């Protein structure tokens, strides 16, 4: 399952991120979540699992796997209903928040930074 990973507080020019900064999508080993997480950590950042309720794999399994790989947190509060005006989705967000909290992971809110236009995100 391919997932989005949000990197926070990292050094953009760090050599461990070079493969991700050349404009093309990463392939092979560099595409693996474990490799992405390690590169972010090497660059001094935090690795966050973005919107764990949007994948074909259940969020509980994804969060558990991310924790095992060393992720620092997950995006708990997200607009899964993709409303015209951003609003979190109570039932799924509360369940994700509990799961992250029980694992001692950081919880984030909002968006995993897909560009400048956040309308509807």
Descriptions of predicted regions:
Residues 68-71, 102:
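Alpha-helix termination/capping residues and helix-transition junctions
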Residues 35-38, 61-64, 94-98, 102, ...:
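Alpha-helical scaffolding segments of alpha/beta enzyme cores, especially the outer helices
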Residues 1-69:
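Extended substrate/RNA-proximal surfaces in nucleic-acid metabolism proteins
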Residues 10, 52-53, 79-81, 112-116:
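Active-site beta-loop-alpha junctions enriched in small/polar residues
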Residues 71-85:
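His/Asp/Glu-enriched short active-site or ligand-binding loop at hydrolase and phosphoryl-transfer sites
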Residues 1-4, 57-66, 83-95, 116-121:
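Histidine/acidic-residue-rich catalytic or RNA/ligand-binding cores of hydrolases
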Residues 48-51, 74-77, 106-111:
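Active-site neighborhood of phospho(di)ester-bond hydrolases with catalytic His/Asp-centered motifs
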Residues 104-120:
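Short acidic/histidine-rich active-site segments
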């Amino acid at each position: 399952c391919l997932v989005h990973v949000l990197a926070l507080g990292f050094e953009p020019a760090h050599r461990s991120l070079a493969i991700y900064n050349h404009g093309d999508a990463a392939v092979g080993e560099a595409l693996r979540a474990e490799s992405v997480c390690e590169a972010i950590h090497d660059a001094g950042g935090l690795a966050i699992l973005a919107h764990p309720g949007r994948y074909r794999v259940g969020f509980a399994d994804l969060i558990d796997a991310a924790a095992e790989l060393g992720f620092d947190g997950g995006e708990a509060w997200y607009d899964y209903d993709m409303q015209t005006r951003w609003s979190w989705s109570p039932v799924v967000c509360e369940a994700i928040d509990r799961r992250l909290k029980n694992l001692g992971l950081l919880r984030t809110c909002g968006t995993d930074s897909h560009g400048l236009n956040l309308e509807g995100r």
